[in-house]
Design a protein with these regions (language model features):
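Catalytic-pocket segment enriched in acidic/His residues
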Residues: 48-213
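Short, structured patches in soluble enzyme cores that scaffold and shape functional sites
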Residues: 14-22, 40-45, 74, 89
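Glycine-centered loop/turn motifs
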Residues: 1-2, 139
Length: 213
């Protein structure tokens, strides 16, 4: 993972990647498994220095070169129910969750996306991440482990080149950026925490859809 030289707030997000195997459009949730080729591990890194600019779209935050690695391979026969998933930084567990804790299951995600977007073979949908996404730095080693899918490991390095300041928005370190990148740790810095924009603050349903196979 390459962090631009003039950026500071690169966060990990251990996730599961759903790999589409057949063209899907307006499908039923109960049929979604027929359109899934398999699953693999993903790390949906976010470059939150651009959070202010990209609020709502995440184009720069999530779309920079080298971000969102997936692997090590696609597992075709995997039951996603009640599987453990962890993110480990330099040997220390930072995220520790289970697929049972997800707001929506994999079949729901596929059916939801296919309502308005035609999914084609090779498309990837990410599952969302457990709590405690935090910033990593050059020299760190980040691994995402998902039970039954394997381990995805990345080394964080700094690019010798900064983001160009000739055009476009520049990296920032506003309260919005810091509250997202540092999460709950922002409170321990003795600072006022602004209104949360974290995923856990979104209006997830109190009752999750039942798994369907």
């Amino acid at each position: 993972m390459v962090r631009p030289a003039n950026c500071n707030w690169l966060n990990y997000e251990g996730e599961i990647a759903i790999v589409i195997g057949k063209t899907a459009r307006n499908i039923k949730m109960a049929d979604a498994h027929h359109y899934i080729a398999g699953y693999t591990v993903a790390n949906d890194y976010g470059l939150h220095d651009f959070r202010d600019t990209d609020s709502g779209s995440m184009l720069r935050v999530k779309g920079a070169d080298t971000l969102c690695p997936v692997g090590p391979g696609v597992v075709t026969d995997w039951d996603f129910r009640n599987k453990g998933m962890r993110t480990i930084v330099n040997g220390e567990v930072r995220q520790d969750g289970s697929t049972e804790e997800m707001a929506w299951d994999m079949h729901y995600l596929v059916a939801d996306m296919a309502r308005l977007i035609t999914l084609v073979p090779g498309d990837i949908i990410l599952s969302g991440t457990p709590a405690y996404s935090r910033t990593v730095y050059p020299g760190d080693v980040v691994s995402v482990e998902v039970e039954g899918l394997g381990t995805l490991t990345n080394h964080i390095v700094s690019s010798p080149e900064p983001v160009s300041d000739e055009v476009g928005a520049q990296p920032t370190a506003t309260e919005e950026v810091l509250s997202t990148a540092l999460g709950g740790d922002w409170e321990f810095r003795g600072q006022r925490r602004p209104n949360s924009t974290q995923k856990e603050a979104l209006p997830y349903p109190l009752v999750r859809p039942r798994y369907e196979s």
